[in-house]
Swiss-Prot record:
EC code: 2.4.99.24
Pathway annotation from the record: Bacterial outer membrane biogenesis; LPS core biosynthesis
Protein name (record): Lipopolysaccharide heptosyltransferase 2
GO cellular component: cytosol
Length: 348
């Protein structure tokens, strides 16, 4: 069986989608699974053994461009896919499998995609609370799984593969010392500071960890580089020698490898949080207005700290510098306690 998956366009969603690929492979061991997704996803997809080929989606996230999608769909006809699974909810994301003439096209209804999809599932959000469960449900025939409780347990969570050789090579590439174990920080998050733990809290935690004998490495995109510099600036000269701001300095694949080399990760609710979970790194995840009830880190080594309940549609924080008060209220001491408990568990 040949399967095409139209993948998501965000790092976190792409990571969670691996649970669908793992479930499909478990159900259909002979299946060939290709994933169409933005080209930047390739480093993630190449580390998922279930994925045969990552096909770049050349069209932008917001562009409809029906003519281009028709052309793209027609170019895939020679691959003769048997099934398609469409993970984004947008109308446009269902066009390529339709134009490719794939006989069985599955997805949640989303933007009223009757016709484009011929195996349409209507989402009951209460029956399927987690995004990862919604992805996995698509692997089963319609009506068989009525709620998340019906899914076979344990769920096949995302797992990325990184070799020891890659870790030592990439640490050398970035001149990271082997003298001290690394703790990774992921201080960025989409939509600005509202989902971020304040940089001054990260700085305070970094000071304590460096004084305890760790080195701290900051990960993220170029957009997060400034936040990283703010953390660095709060350290004294001696401490700065053991803190590296690699936000915007690494390719995604290098960040994946270096996160795998870390003893543990402290992170906001971000795409890299899901990467760290898939690498089975001990991690402390800090949530504010966004909710871990929908997209938690999928790992038994994750600890979530959140001081409020419910989901808050907040794109701007309510306090100075745009931070959300519920994240300001999470103290560095509380995070350090959770982190130390995880590190002790790991050593045991």
């Amino acid at each position: 069986m040949k399967i095409l998956v139209i993948g998501p366009s965000w790092v976190g969603d792409m990571m969670m989608s691996q649970s669908l690929y793992r479930t499909l492979q478990a159900r259909y061991p002979q299946a060939i699974i290709d994933v169409m997704a933005p080209a930047w996803c390739r480093p993630l997809l190449s580390r998922m053994p279930e994925v045969n080929e990552a096909i770049p989606m050349p069209l932008g996230h917001g562009a409809l461009e029906i003519g281009e999608r028709r052309k793209l769909g027609h170019s895939l006809r020679e691959k003769r896919y048997d099934r398609a699974y469409v993970l984004p909810n947008s109308f446009k994301s269902a066009l390529v499998p339709f134009f490719a003439g794939i006989p069985h096209r599955t997805g949640w209804r989303g933007e009223m995609r009757y016709g484009l999809l011929n195996d349409v599932r209507v989402l009951d959000k209460e029956a399927w609370p987690l995004m990862v469960e919604r992805y996995i449900a698509l692997a089963y025939d319609k009506g068989i799984m009525r709620t998340a409780q019906d899914l076979p347990q344990p769920l096949l969570w995302p797992q990325l593969q990184v070799s020891e050789g890659e870790k030592s090579y990439t640490c050398n590439q970035f001149s990271l010392s082997s003298e001290r174990p690394m703790i990774g920080f992921c201080p960025g998050a989409e939509f600005g500071p509202a989902k971020r733990w304040p940089h001054y809290h990260y700085a305070e935690l970094a000071k304590q960890l460096i004084d305890e004998g760790y080195q701290v490495v900051l990960f993220g995109s170029a957009k997060d580089h400034e936040a990283g510099n703010e953390i660095l600036a709060a350290l004294n000269t001696e401490q700065q020698a053991w803190c590296r701001n690699l936000a915007g300095e690494t390719q995604l694949d290098q960040a994946v490898i270096l996160i795998a080399a870390c003893k543990a990760i402290v992170t906001n609710d971000s795409g890299l949080m899901h990467v760290a979970a898939a690498l089975n790194r001990p991690l402390v995840a800090l949530y504010g207005p966004s909710s871990p009830d929908f997209t938690p880190p999928l790992s038994h080594k994750a600890r979530v700290i959140r001081l409020i309940t419910g989901y808050h549609k907040v794109r701007k924080g309510d306090a100075a510098e745009g931070y959300h008060q519920s994240l300001i209220d999470i103290t560095p001491q509380r995070v350090l306690e959770e982190l130390n408990a995880l590190l002790l568990q790991e050593e045991a």
